[in-house]
């Protein structure tokens, strides 16, 4: 069977799993092993990074550098220094993926300007690790590997169990659409990386990375329409057709309730520390921690569901979607707007929009955001100096052609015009 990277179409499916007590123990063991390996490798590389800076001044460091590079480059050397990685419950592929994630983080640090030095992974209530599916030579279906559905009887039409590496058969549940896709896409489909995780509320999930040469979904029909969108904080976005999509502000709506729950959690933590009790043994603290986590998850899920609906609706109705290339990370540094920007979740919106455009055969592109607000979409005049439109002004009139503009609608029209200009140059 071909590698995932060599296949044309990619899809991710997440199912909720219900592990037994023994399987929960195995998940916890592999989460700990992955975190330990990642942190050990990070400690080695941080020390290497410091020693190499001073090696020219102190030749004595060269021996230590050679030893650290040897440990870093050899998985066997690493496993030999950490005996518990040889235990039967430890998935060797979880160790491989931890090393791969570590190497990827350091490559990003070295190659991407502005990326900070990789830090350590902290132990938390949430758990996760990654493993991979294996196939025999000549396998044609993803169910011929070590990840496959398990049917407890010959007449069972809908599978309720899935077999995962090390964990074995485990009960699962997912939406009907995801299950139909998994059961229909067997031939010429490969499962790549599998992420097993437990969230802060104690629920377990398995995410399957699927690759195939056959599309996972049918493309949406062409509409011949194109649209530019202007992102803002009052609304989610305004498009070049004049449509305004509201911003439900889920985080702000839950802010008071969440703050109250977090204050209560903080007081319980202080009481436990004062009484010299472990937080794991403080039952009231754990109950309140769970209540707080449920509130946070509710906000996150509500926001994600809304973005899923809006991005799919946009991709379904348009052949080309053009947006400003916003530097969300830089904008979050503005402490006055950071909470509102995080609440509207522009970054997730763009990621979902790009994924759905690829999945359904449409096109999404970004154009520079410079002066989209200050430019008249009618005549192209750019407001400069004292003429510049301040942030709070929602309407303005062009001093050259006299057209009266709504700020966001005008910006969306400029975004679309720039996108069409780029498309014309590509033809």
What role is predicted for each listed range?
Residues 1-427:
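Nucleic-acid substrate recognition interfaces
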